[in-house]
Amino acid sequence: MKLSELFNPNEFAARHLSFGDEAALLAAVDEKSMDEFVGNTVPQSIRMPSELDLPEALTEADALAKLKGIASKNMINKSYIGLGYYPTRVPNVILRNVLENPGWYTAYTPYQAEIAQGRLEALLNFQQVCIDLTGFPVAGASLLDEATAAAEAMAMAHRVGKVKSERFFVDERVYPQTLDVMKTRAKYFGFELVVGDFAQADEGEYFGALFQYVGKDGDVQDLQDVIGRLKAKGTIVAVAADIMSLVLLKSPAELGADIALGNTQRFGVPMGFGGPHAAYFAFKDEFKRSAPGRIIGVSKDASGKPALRMALSTREQHIRREKATSNICTAQALLANLAGMYAVYHGPKGVKRIADRIHALASAFADALVSDGLNVVHKVFFDTVTVDFGNKEKADQVFAAALESGYNLRRVNDTQVAAAFHETSACEDLVDLYRAFTGKDTFAFADDVKGRLNAELLRQDDILQHPVFNSYHTEHEMLRYLKKLEDRDLAMNRSMISLGSCTMKLNATAEMLPITWAEFSDIHPYAPEAQTAGYRELLADMENSLKAITGFDAISLQPNSGAQGEYTGMLSIRRYQEAQGEAHRNICLIPKSAHGTNPATAAMLGLKVVVVDTDEHGNVNIDDLKAKAEQHRDALSAIMITYPSTHGVYEEGIRDICRIIHENGGQVYMDGANLNAQIGIMQPAEVGADVLHMNLHKTFCIPHGGGGPGMGPIGLKAHLAPFAPGHTLTDTHSASAGQTAVAAAAYGSASILPITWMYLTMMGKQGMEQATRWALLNANYVAKRLSEDYPILYTGKNGRVAHECIVDLRPLKAESGITETDIAKRLMDYGFHAPTVSFPVAGTLMIEPTESESKAELDRFIATLKSIRREVQKVIDGEWPKDDNPLVNAPHTAADITGNWAHPYSREEAVFPLPFVREHKFWPFVNRVDDVYGDRNLVCSCPPMENYED
């Protein structure tokens, strides 16, 4: 035997892909080889002229070792920087059983409520935490970050307010990263931001105002008077409040505000160099239909039992398109679950003890400094002690002394230094920091500490009184609660999730391991650059790999969701055109088949949407495109186009589309939702795109997390690169100075980038191209097998689809009365999550199997849909009544088959319709959820469940 043949650097590709299935899959689609298949599927006109310029693959062990070497270049100092990011402790029971558990992180956004009741309950818990702490009756299930939430509050204030003004007041004490993002958003909404002293906010006329509750430098101000004066004028008031401080302080609602927002990172989520973290967003009840993001509500199921669901979805981009309240799609569900569970585990007494400890340590430190003659700037504070040394030299000396001792402080200005205390602060830290600030080695502090918060600002009401926050404080109880919820959810650790346009592929264990390494998770986003060399190397690696894959000249990693990447790409076009003296270009062409985020994004940037028709094959109608591009040539800004098309087909005219837009003065934005069908086969930049957003949570293996996190970096041609987002506190190496940001952190959700780095490193150049080929092969195998029972709506060259296919249920629905929803719910009885329902065409299922599913799993899924087709036939033939059959009654629960049974089909037909289901059985926790009841009777807090038993 040859020793060289016993080492296999491509071992991971063989774990990600099912190479042993190749011959059978090719035979099923009537092809002799993979090369022949790809040649018959992908138009030659779009094929990239050269191979991918990526390194060869490394094994799992070698990739982890290499990444560990990179991570070790980061320096973990004790962080006292603050500014919205704080060290915290993730309870280990939550770390292991949620964050590191594929039952939680591989699930999709809970559109199919019946198989997502566990996650929905966890998100409802999160909402209840936000409701209790803010005092408002309604809270959402997370936004992307605090800065984005502030921008959303500004937009919502304009929607719901009555003041006829385009001016918005911003407290000068807000975090600088928040103001940066608000400037970006305000410009294209046509708002004027006025930044000033909070106490003078009522001196002008504003449609809205934002105050920081615990200012950026640590002060806590009583906002009641100024809020009252603004409310008297009709101004909508938002308060950005530190979530931990609200454990002790009066709620924003009690202060008189209309909206509260902030970051929940302090509730057990690592800093992670800036993200991901779940922002909270709470508000008055009358604003609920104008709010951005997901809201979880209590409804009932078909049997009358309480059931949870995503409520008020008619506000959202996939329905309202350019009239949506926001372009938000993915949010931060996994991080919201972590924060909610932190409150569940610690309970009201536990979180108060933590908040009191933080405040007591800060107060003790301030007392010691004052007794030593130092000037503590703010007399009333929660966690941040700011000291003015009166001269730069002394401030420099203190800052350097702390750094030498392993502490990162915040330099407020030339003469001021701040220390922000947090959950992991300890008494020995007081000694070290006192030495740095005073030069003295001894520090004796009294055990009895007087707090620095005014009595009139303290919270008087009780928080977290619901039983869920008072029942699971031992690890055994918490472990079992988490397991109970996990078992109510269908995630990819149970079966494939074939959601079209979502790319639910393997999230390999080796990819996930590094995100909890302290070298990545415990780094503050504003840590000194010398301490973040590992992150800088990781970022550079990522940018170079993404440039090689897409063909673009520059990459921005800042956008922390796909929708935000979309916004950022279009923003770069707008900024470029303004710099060219073409700010008047405000027409955006969007194909009729586009995802709802596209028109919503265009509207956020002040663009007017002009819809382009598609032809009978699902392709962009080139004649209509040409006519509309020429009609609007003087005002044409861009086209937003998805490739392969949203209909799952490689459009052969993509180069012509790009040429027509360019000839008429526009730019080409390509939506990267379907990038999984491109890598190694084509490059978006090479076919004519000017900018592209990529979903790292689709194509590049970051898990969907049950509704986030995601990352949406953009690739840009050289002429657009200077207009990518910058950052007010970080000199981003991928953007020019002077451009405002789109996210709170310079590199978005940086701590999950190691997932994509590992995927690219373990797959290598050959594996990445193989992944694309397998995605195409699996999709065409499914389409070919299902075409025997269902029409495949759109196909391209040689009758092929790209990486997904659309099954047309409309003829069957017309004949039987069985709807696409009935089929989606019936799939649950077989143990499968439904494909994408009624998008991009109503009455269809869009199926994307991805490259990482085996033939055995594909065959189970195909057998399921074939079995369902036979069930529909029984309805057509009259064997089962139209109003009483396994489809309209789906899904079936364990309670159904153990109770009275009066249906014309058997219990076995209901829950074990095929032999394999017995082995793989997943039991939905509730029957079909009543969406209408839930929206008409909106409850988005944790009610006593017995209230709903009747």
From Swiss-Prot:
Keywords from the named record: Oxidoreductase, Pyridoxal phosphate
Residue numbers bearing the N6-(pyridoxal phosphate)lysine modification: 698
Signal peptide range in chain numbering: none
EC assignment: 1.4.4.2
Cofactor: pyridoxal 5'-phosphate
A cellular component term, taken from the record's GO annotations: glycine cleavage complex
Domain of life of the source: Bacteria
Keyword match Oxidoreductase: yes
Pfam families the UniProt entry points to: GcvP2_C, GDC-P
GO biological process, one term: glycine decarboxylation via glycine cleavage system
The family this protein is said to belong to: Belongs to the GcvP family.
Subunit structure: The glycine cleavage system is composed of four proteins: P, T, L and H.
Function comment: The glycine cleavage system catalyzes the degradation of glycine. The P protein binds the alpha-amino group of glycine through its pyridoxal phosphate cofactor; CO(2) is released and the remaining methylamine moiety is then transferred to the lipoamide cofactor of the H protein.
The name this protein goes by in its record: Glycine dehydrogenase (decarboxylating)
Organism of this sequence: Neisseria meningitidis serogroup A / serotype 4A (strain DSM 15465 / Z2491)
Gene from which this protein is expressed: gcvP
